[in-house]
Every structure is written in C-alpha cells, then in structure tokens.
Amino acid sequence: MKLQIYNPNGEEFQYDFKSDIPFSFHIKNLYENLVVHNNGLKKILQSFPYCEANRSYDEIYSHYSLQEATSGNWMSNSTDSTFIKGSPDNTLFFKLKPLTHYLTPIEKLIGTTTSSSSSSSSPSSSSSSSSSSSSSSPSSPSLIGLILSLQTHLALLMYENIYGNKNNSKDTNNSGTINNNNNNNNNSGGSNIKLSSTPSSSFLTFPTSTSNLLLSSDVIKKILNIVFLAPSPQSLQLLVFLVSNSPSNDDLLSQISNTHSNSQLHGFSIGGGGGGSGNNSSITSIGGGDSKKIENKDNSGSAVVGSQSNSPQSSSFVKSQQIQQQQQYQKPNNSSPPPTTTTTTTTTTTTSGSQVKLSVGGNSGSFNNTTESSPSLFTLVDTAIKSVSTEHSSNFYLHILNNPAYNEVIETHFEMVCLILSLINNMYRLSPNPINYFNRLHNDSILKYIMEFAKKNQKIYQNTQYIVLRNYLMKELHMQRLHPINVDKVLSHQILLSDLWGSALSSYPFGGINSEHWLLLGFRSSNPMEDFKNTGVLALRNLSYFSKQHLQPFQSLLLTQTKREKDDNDNNNNKVIDKPIITNKFNIETLDDDNDNNNNQELNNNNNNNNNNNYNIKTKPRSNSRSYPLATVAISLTYTLSNIFRIGRINDSPIDSSIWDIAFSGSNWFDEIFVTTFNLFESLWHSEAHSYSDFPQVISHTREIIEKVCSKSPINLQDFKDKLTTLLEKKDEISSLDVNTVETLARYHQLQPSHINKRHIHKFFGERVNVDKLPNSNNPTDNIITTNTNTTTTTTTSTNNDCESTILQDHIESDKNNDDNNNNNEIIDDCESNSSFLVSSNTKEFSGKNLIKFFGEKTDQKEQYSTQPSNVKSYKLKNFFGDQPVVINKNGGGGGGGGGGGVDNELNQGGETVNKNKNDLIDDSDDENDNDEVNNNNNSNRINQDINHKLYGNSPISERNHRLHVFFGEWFDTEQVEYNEKIRSSSSTPDTSSPPLNSQPESARLHKLNKFFGERVNIPISKPKVIGEGGGGGIFPIDDIDVTDGSTNNHHIGGGGGGGSSDNLLSRSPEETRSDFKAQKVLGERLDIKKEKESINFASQPSNVREYKLHKLFGEMVPAHKQKSPKLQGGSGPWKKGNVSKSDSQAVVAPLNTIKFNNGNTNMNPLLQSCPTPINSPTSLSSDHLLDDVLDLNQTNNNIDNENDDINEAIIPPSLSPTLLGVNNHGEEEEEEEEEEEGYNHTQDNHAQDNHAQDNLLLLDDDDDTKSEPIPSTNTLLDSDIIPNNTTTTTTTTTTTTTTTTNTTGQKRISILSTDTNRPGSSNYGESSLSNGSRFDGIPESTTHNANGDDDHQINLHSSSPQPLPKFVNTDDEDNNNNNNNKKQDDDEDDEDDDDKEEIRKKRENKTNHRLHVFFGERFDVENIHFFTRVSSSPGSYDAHLNNPHLSVSPQPETVRSYKLKKFFGKNPEDNVTLSSSYDSSTSPLLSQLNHHHHHNHHQSASNLINNINNNNNNNNNNNSNNNSNNQNNLNSSNNSNNSSISNNSGKNNTNNNNNNNTNNNNDNSPSTSPSSSFKKHQYQYVSAEDPEGDVSKTNEIRKLRRDFKTQRILGERLNIKKESTVVAFQDQPSTIKVDKLISLFGEKVGFSLKRKESQRDLQHQASSSNLKFSLASSSK
C-alpha cells in the first residue's frame, strides 16, 4: 500500500507500506532514509553528545513515529485502520514523538517510588518505556534509562527545530502540512519563534516546517519536578541541557556573524555557556579589556528561545557590530552609553531582501522582528524553580547540593556541584537582570555553599564552570569601572548621585550635577562628574553605598573633617590663599600655602596632561591642615582597590584570579571592603598625618596594608577584616612599613560598628544597665550637621541640653530633694565625659551576687562567667564606659614634708570646710546643695556626703564609676609595683597626717581601702606630669594631655607645707599612658582625656557588698559593718595592741637632757656605725618588742655621779613618744606566735633606710677628738654574731640603753643610746648589766682584737630613729651601783638549752613561707618582702612640744587589719575564740610564771634597777667567786669581772640565784618580750617545770585548729563560716593569684598580726589609746 509521507526535511515521497512487516521495521527504514537524504542531520547526530550510552546509533529511530494528517492520531502498529484503508489521499508525517510520551512514565515511576506503590502502566506509543514497571528507586536503571531517553528526545527536538531546515532550499506549499506563516525563506532572517497561548498555559513554539515542539510552563515544571524528586547527574543534565542550548541575544549575534558550521555545533557541550558561541574559551576574560574576546560577551540582556537565521549575513553588518562593541570597551571615557542600558539599532538586508531590526544590549533583551512579546526561557525556568521550591518547602538549588544520597560519594557530589554551576551560569546568561538573579542567590546562601564546598574540594578551583561563574560575579564591577557616568541618559546613575546627596546634604535641595554644594563633600569642583572620570561608575557606587548603608559613620567622618578644619582655623588665624589640587591617577598632591611658589612643592607631579585637573577650589584644605576632602579620598581609594583587585583589567593568571574568590561571599563585598579601607585610611591619617601634605604617604601605607591582606586570599568579608586586624595588631609583621599600629588600631576599632549588647554588659558587670542610653560610637546624631547659608560650611550643634534633661531626670528620680537648677555643671561634665549612658535605673541592684559574677564564681547554673585574669588592666572596664576624670589640684602647695599642706589644709577642719582648692571646678551656686544624699544619720558621714556632692554631684554615674575603680583600681598594674603617682589623703587633719615614710604614702592605702569598700572619700589626685613613662611608651599624642605648665618641679606628691601656687598638670600614671585600643575596640570611640576634670567619686555600698568583697579577696566572710569594741584594760603602742600592763604604774620617763656623760678614754671601733632601719620595715624592731629588753632609766639622773662635769655636752634627743609602750598580759604571746607563723620577713627596706640615714647616726665621743661614727646595722651581722645573753637584767619600760665598752687599757664606758620607743624602728632591745668591770651586753656585738691581743667586743647598735642620738658617756662611779643589789634576786629562773625550740620555730617559719608560695603561685623571695604597718593617734593626743611629727599615722581600717591575711596563713575565723583562749595566762602555767616575773620587774624603778644591776655584779665578784669558775666565757680575760659578759653557750652558765634572776625574759612565750622578729630566732625559750611541754602542746593545738581551714583553702572547697552575715559560701582564690593583686589594692605589701576579736578596737579608740597620759592613767588604775 502506497502512503504519502512527509519527512522532517520537508520532502514528500510515497512509501510502500506492508502490513506483514513489523511497524518498528518501517520506522527504522524511514529513519535511515531521512538520514541518507539529509547531510545536515547526519552531522548533527554525529556531533550529538547525548546518545544513549547503552544503545547503538541506529536505535535513535525509536523516537520517531508516524502521525495522520487529518486526524492527528499517532500510528502504533501495522494493523492500524489507517493502513488497512490504504487511501492514497491519506497523508502521514514522519517526525519525532511528543514529550508527553516520555514525561508521563517518569512521573508515574517517581510517584511509585516515593509512595512505595507499584505501577506497571506505560504508554503504548512508547516502546522505550516498557521496562519502567520494574523500577523500585529513583536511581534505578529503569528510571535512569527513561531520563536518558527523555533527554535524547529533547535534544533531537531542539536540534531538529534549530538546524534541521538549513539545507532545505524548496518551498513547501502542500495544503496538508501544518500552517506556518514563517515557513518561507523571505522571513528566514527573523525569528522563527512565535507565542502560542492557550487558556491554561503559555507555550514556547518552534514554528519550523516540521516542528511539533510545545515547551509550555507545565512541561518545564514537570522537568524541574523530576530533577527535584530524583536528583541525579542524569536528571540534572536534562535541565542544564534545556537552558544551555537556548541561544541568548549574544549567541544570536554570534550565529548571524558566522555560517552554520561544525564549530557552531560544538558549542552545545555541557554548560558550554551558550549555544554556538564558544563561551568556554572567552568568558574567562570578561571585563578584561580584550576586544577580540569580549566583543560577544555583553550578556546583560535576556534571551528568547528561537532559531538561527537560515541565511548568512553580510560582512558589513558583522564588522559594524564588532567595531561598535570594541569601542564600547576600549573607550569607556567617551560619551557612548554602556551596552547594558542603551539600545543600538542597525538595519541590514538579508539575502531575501527583507529588513530586520536587531535590538542589541537593551534592557528588554528582545531579538525579534514581530510585534509579539514572548516570555524568555529564563522567566519560565525561574518561575518553575520558585514554584517547585514553594511546593516542597525547600530551596531547589540547596536541595540538590545537599542531597545526602550523593554527598557521601565524593565524585558524584562533585559532578552535581559542577552541574549546578553550569545551570547558574546559563541562567545568568539568559537573565534579563543578572544582578538581581545573583542577589537572590546570595540571599539564599547558594553561592556561600559553593564557597564552603570549594574549601573542602580544591579541584573545583580548576573547574571551568567555577571560573566562569567567578568571572560573571566580577563582570558588573568590570563594567562599572570602565563605563563613565552618564546622568542624563542612565537612570541608575541619577539614583546613585541623588542617594549621595540625600545622605550628606539632606538639608539642601538636590542641585543636580552642577552645584557648589558638592564642594562641601570634598569634590574638587562643582561638577563631580569630572572627579569620577578615571574610576567610572564604580567610585560613585562606593560613595553612594557608604553614605546610604553606613550613614552614621559617614556623617561622623564629615563632622570630623569639619572639627579638624575648625581647630586649624583656631590655631592659625592668618588668611589662607586657596591653591588647586593637582592629581595624577588620584595620587593627590598639594601645593604649600606659604608664599613659596617653587615647583618643588608639588608632590609626585608626574602627570603631563593636568591642565584639565586644575580647578578653582574654594574649600580645599590647607597644606598644614589635618583635614582632608572626603570625596576626593574616596575616589582615590576606589581607584586603588580596583587596581589591587584587577577590576577592569585582563586577568588571565589563575593566581591573580584567586583574589576574586571573595566575590562569592556577598553581593556588596567590594563596597564593604571600600568602607573598611576608608576606615583604615582614617586610622592611618589619625596616627600619622600632621598636615594635608602627608596624603601620599598615608595612601601608600593604606595600599601596602591592603595588598598584604589580599595576598592572603581572604575568602569572605569577615576573613578580610580579621586579617587586617591581625596585621594592625602586629601579629603578622608588615614588611618595610613603619606604622604606629597602636594609635591606628585604636582609631580603627573606634570606627567599626559596635556590637555591644546587654548580654556583654551583664557578663562584665553582672548588673543591668540601661542599654537604651548606650550611645552608638558611630552615631552622628549626637552632633547634628547643620549649615550656615552665609558661609556654606558645616557647623555642629551640641546636644548638651538633651544630655542635661536626660541626666537631670535621673537626678530627680534618685534624690527628690535635689535642686534641678544647681546641677548644670555636673550634668555638663557628665555629657562631656561621654558617660551619660552609664546611668543605671537602680544603683541598689548592685550586690554581692554581682561581685561573684565579676570574679568568675558560678552563681547560676544557666549563666557562667569567665574568670578575670589577674593581670587585667585598669582600662578594661574604665575605658568601657569612658575614662574617669581626675581633679587638678590647681592651688595646692607642692612641697613635700609635713602633713596637711596644700589640699589638706582646708579640708575637714571641724568637718565643715570644703577644700578651697577644688572650688575651681565647682560653681558657687553649688553651695546650696548641702542637703544632697541625706540618707546617713551620722553627722560626719553627712558632712562628707555633702562635700562629695558639691564636688562630684549625686549622679548615679559616679557610683557606677566607683564600682569600676573598685574592681580594678585606678593603678591596677601588675607589671609595675612602684607607682609614680601618689595620692594625698584629705580625710585627716594635719595633726594626724604624716608624710610618706617610704615609697608608698600612708594615705594611698587608706584611699585604696576606702575605694575597695565603697566609702565616699574626697581625695584629689595631684600627680606629676608623666608623658611616655612606664610601660605605656607615650603612645598618646602630647596634645591629648592638658599641659598648662612646663615645669615639673612644682608638682609634688600630695599637699605639703610648701604652699606653692603653681598649677598641677593633668597627667597619667604609667598605666594610664598605656594604649586604650582594647577599650576602643569594644566601644569604637576615642576617649578624650582633656575633658576629665572630675574627681573620683565613691558610692556607699551596702555592708553585705563590702563583706562579699573582703570574703572574695581573703576567702572568708568579713563583717565589714561591725567595728570591734576596744579592750580598755590594756594600753596600746603604735605597733601592737594591748602592750601596756596594769602593773606599769610606777613607770616614769626621765628626760634624757638631764643625763651627764663622762669623758672617758675610749678607743671607738669604726664598725660602730648606725645603719638605720626604715621605720616601716619589718626588720626595724617595733617599740614594744625593744622595750621588753632595755633598762628603765626613769631615775638614772638621780644615781649618776654629778662629779663628771667635764663630759662632752650630750646631744639633746627628741622628746619621747606620748605613748608609753607596755606589755599586755593576754595578747603579746599570741601576737608573737602569730607573727612567727605568718613568716614575716626580716630584711631591711633599703629605700626607706636611705631616707633616714642622716637622722639615725649614733654619735661616738673620744678623748682626743669628737667624731660622729655610725654604728653598723644589725642587717650587716651574720646570725652567728648575734649572741643572746643570759646574765643580764632586762625591763620593758625604758627608752635608754646604757652600754659599757672596754678599751685596750681596761677602762669602761657606758654609752646611753636614746631611742624613740614609739617609733617603728626603735632599737632598744638588748639586755644590759652594768657594773665595775662589766659592760652593757644587751646588744649583739662583733668581736675585734685590740693591740694587746685581747678581744674587744664592740656593740652593734640598731636604730632607725630619725633624730640624733646621745653620745657615749663613760662613768666609773661604782658607789651608785650598790643601792639595789638584792632587788631582783627573787626573780631568778632556771636556764635551759632552747635549741629544740629554735628548730621548731624555724620549721614553722619555713612552713609559713611555703604557704606564701602556695598562695601566690610562684617562688618569690619571701625574705625580701616588706610588710609595713602604721600607728595611729587621736587628734587630741598630739603634743606640740614633741619634736617628732611622724608618730601619728593613720592606721588600716579595723576590718582589714583583722582579716586581711588570715587566709594567707591558715587561720580559721570560726576558731578565733579557741585560738585566743589558748594563749590566756590563766590556762598556761608557763605563761603565768613568766607574767609573774614580768610584773615584778615592772614594779622596780629605773634607779633601783640600775643599782640592783651594779650591786648584783659586785656580789658576783666578791661573794660568789667559787661559782664564777663556771663563767669563763667572757672574751676579755684580763678582767676578773667577766661573768656577766655575753656567752654563746647559755647552758654552761651558773645557775645560782644571783646570776639567773633576770634571765630569758625575752622568751618567745613571754608576753613581756615581744621583740622584733629579727631577733626571735636568736633567743631561747624556757619551759616551766610544771608544764615542760606546754609550748609544744599549744603549737600542736594551733596546727590542729587550722588544719581543716588549710585544706579548704588549698583545695578550693566551700567554706562553712558560721558567722557569715549571709548564707552564701564562696570558693577560695586560685593559687595563681599574684602578690601584686594585693599591692594594687593597698599600695604595698602589708603585714598584720592576727589578734583576738576581743582585742580589736575601732580607729578612734586606738588613736586615743596611744596617748601617753591615757596609758599611764589606765595602767595606774
């Protein structure tokens, strides 16, 4: 049977159809005939890349079938009715099957797999779908086969419709064919695509002569749904093939300019970047400036699916297109618009003679010759992707990239990513607005995922699709860099320009491109287009982005330039002649504004064509100005960045292209880098530039730093910033670049946006802060920019009024009695200090829990605060809320010495006078504010609060600042122990104040303690000028310091008697001179130290807060709010409490000016030198210790022979202390034992020793010439030189030591050493026995050999008294020594060897030192630690006739004195009662016995005591000669009266009553002998026979009592303190706490004796109890 058949070539022929032959054989035969007669189809099939892998070339025929022309039915077998009828008029079409025959079985199979149901149905018309019923998974072979068949069929349809008709030269006019209006060659030059619309969907129709392809939105959505539900490389290739082989506008231009050849067919590779254009080979140079490669790369327009023209175009049209695009890229400075926004229309004539208009590069991107508008393939695909993503609630791209089925297989995952890259590249090529498309990909984090994948798999960097996508991301920047601004024709350029105007010049109406107001932004002329000439649209884009997205920092920079210019005008009132700026590729150069017009003033003037760059600049900064034109600098930075990132240049090197990887991080990455670079420039300018002429240097440094950062290939913006910060912090050195990175980094962090929130503040401070009042560091609204129309310059308006109202409201809420009108000064100061946001809504919220949070203890299981390190600097929190200003003591006297001068003279006189020196900072109207903070019933506290309010105001800001200083201290510097700035106390009167006795002034400790405990103190800070001192290195500019006087001689520490009137400078301590960049990194602002004019203000904290602070520091609860009652029964000395015994009623101090000295012939040894011990040194013997072992010379003047009238006139010593130091029966042994356990070091304070060296010389008198020779100090003696004496008699109530020395002729001399026993360095400690032939042996002596070979014992006297001491006096009167021979015979005691006790004491001391090591966490030199103490006396106890003004020193607060070091040495607070009772004399027979002798000794008068000593020695010589045979230890063998000399072996001494009546009163257990710990280890302890091991048992008891506490302290267990005011338990301090932590609080290493709580007294009573009359009166009772 003959059938009329039409093939896809348009050929009509008759075919003999036989029904006995299978239908498939007929189809195959027709297909082979089609291929034979169509050479073009043969070539297509040969180059076709998507042939089914498991099928032969001939099996493609299965995609073809026959369709009846009249009914449109498809034939399926040979028995069809059409063949049976055999009508010759029946026409059949041999063509491809429809897509629905392949889509339906795949959809059913996917639905069966996802729903776990079976499906065996398949279309009967598709022979390739018969195997789909057995599929069980999306990746099964049956599904893959169906997808490959669909892909092959789709490829055949597209190729056939595009290229199948190229060789057909016939006209087909058969009426039976499908009607097609565009089927003749006359219209072949136009598009063969038309839009067919139906009520249900839109279709993309390929209306060729044999086309049956209908690509509707439903078909595209079905394909995307298949890819989404069955993601695999095969299914994804189907989608990529669909979009990659649709020609874009550029592809059609390329096809028009070339004939249909094999090169066109090879363009249809996977992700080739466009059909037939060879994009793979040329896309990498997009924007590179190569005219040969980029002529076809203007892909900004959209593409409509269509077919290529059948006829070649004329060569003239091709040349015109190439020349036009080459001019657009190579000549960006001309007036031609960019191809992305303009339309170029060219008329050309095709071979048929018809004219076609080609629209190139327009926004619509259309390419047609019809009036119909057809949707692009991009629109259909993108809409379908959005629909599928919405339907499945998952992003289409991310779903495929994160498919877990393929992520585990590396190769498959890599292939999927590459296919997605190809899809994105083709979608970008087809997109009518590729910028918006990329922005959506950035917002969906798709490109970010690709960047993260590239980190894991480095192979993708070499992938072609990755390189293409990276170039596409950079294409926009290339275009904007090369295209000039055309505001008249390009709307986007107008928008950018208007945004810049609206952000910076919003107060002016938009003036267009020609306005004088552009000069205010820093443009070089009124037409900014001239400035953008070399950077194109890119610089305008960067400026517009900066001003719009970073509005506040942008306005802040503008305001900064205005302020700099204003400061320059204030400093230079001369008229400045404006001179033009000459630029050469933005290496901006300036001309000096001096009268010198030489050409050498031009910097780097290499531009030969700069005539057009010279403008009449009206607002150009002077060459000596520190301001710069912002817009000009921005343009220069854009040019610099474009060169660094090679924007607008050819970039063929892969190494250079790697810098573009940062483009995956975000859509505005280049703009953000521009902002960061501008901040860097501002930071460098701030630290380096001194004038505008420094611009080339600053811009060079900026470029070098950015290049250094870019060389590290940052992958995103944050990585770029981190690398830049690391570079500025010098963690990575900058080669050949000397930059002040400290100031630069500080300014850089200040310009960065602040990310501080409530969580950060709570973490630091543990309390709520009104974050709404936190000012943004970049907030320009604090200084609103206004303009003056007369001068057209910007000005600023202060917001002090708003700040006043804000702070004033807080003042009203905190204190209703406050007068609103009298607080303006304080409010303004608060605004100027930039700390108004510190106001807390309720300052009472601060509690111990907050303190625990600060110190790192875990108080809430949900909140954990990190422990603060011990080396935290003061700026960490101080700068967090702004530096706290200090008071400049403008009128205070600068002289040292004396107390109460300068600041102190006017303060606290009756508690009512305010320091006049502070009135410079206080308005007179503030005198009415006497009723502020009326919350304290105590009158003295009330007065202090009124004073502080007048000085500081009652703003909660002061309380906040107090807390900050409480935590860290003003000079918390662990690297520097010796402070260069000191504070003088203003809380004490001149009578009770004293100058510093060592490197640390006394008031510093009190100041720091008050600061620590939250008490209000009004202490002005008077500091010398310090610039660049200490660890800071002088990092701040000198102009930041308020220097009013260049002389530093007038700036002394504290007020003195000098009364100088010169102003003190506001300067900084070594800690304060350190960099503030860490604080600025947090806050993002630079602190203004010039405006710090307020004094430190301390808030009264609740008592429990103070207890918490003490407990946190010392590991135990301290009842800070309770002062201990005084112990009235015991007198008090300046160093120990309860020193005076009641039995000292007969103790009378004899004035030493009545003592006469004999002029004896004595050869003085030059070693007898006084090397005075500093008063504050622990080595200096405390007065109560020393007085235990010296003679009471109360009535010595009555017993000394008056015949010695020829003596040298003695030097009159100062009057004695008003306090007579006695012995407390109950407290001394406890204090002594505790001092031993605390391991006090006994080394000299050499620094303080030198300060008093001139006052502490012991003057010696000789017969021939009077000469002052100092006696060596005890610290020059070895331990072996210190020999305890057991044959001398000692009392504890005298202040004069009588010493006898023996010269070579056997003559003796008694030397009276007068020492102020109330001084800390008193040296009256030795035992003495005076007689004929004996000498005073109470002082360690050094043995020398005289000329006769005899041993001469020279006494080494130790004195630290600053007053001159009397000379030695020799007396030979023996009659006066016989009066009281038998007074002390009943007081003898048995003497025992105490070596075991000495070992026990040494072991105890070693353990104490070990505990110090454990506590402080390091092996520091315990022997060199200086512990200092203070004495106190009441103001009323000061005696004017006493010449020693240093006796009254303010003590430590009582709570700290008792509890400060308990944790250091293992004392358990809850066992204090037991510890105290263990030393009670009623429970210790030994102590009772020793106390008995002690009281007995005190009943003797000084006169009787001396006579007793003399008579006793005479009896020893005359009556007890038999016993003297055992006392041959005397080193002077020429004298028979030697048995009272010092012996090293006390166990061999005679034990008779006469020789032992006064022995060993210096026993460690005796309360009467609490000598300095310097000599404890050389004295012997005696144990009573009744209790031979009493002392050992007490020691063991003490150790047992503190055992548990030590364990808790070391292990950090929770303490169970019974007497806590709250139930909160604390952990101990870690063992790594350094000793400097205490130094930072108290200013020095301070030692305390641990006393019983019963003996603790308040400061007032302790001060009054030190009065001499009070002590004598109490003791007489």
Curated annotation (Swiss-Prot):
Signal peptide residue numbers: none
Keyword field: Coiled coil
Bridged cysteine pairs (disulfide): none
Biased composition (Polar residues): 1306-1334, 1445-1454
Biased composition (Acidic residues): 922-933, 1228-1238, 1387-1397
Pfam family, one: ELMO_CED12
Organism annotation: Dictyostelium discoideum (Social amoeba)
Name listed for the protein in its UniProt record: ELMO domain-containing protein E
Domain of life: Eukaryota
GO molecular function: G-protein beta-subunit binding; small GTPase binding
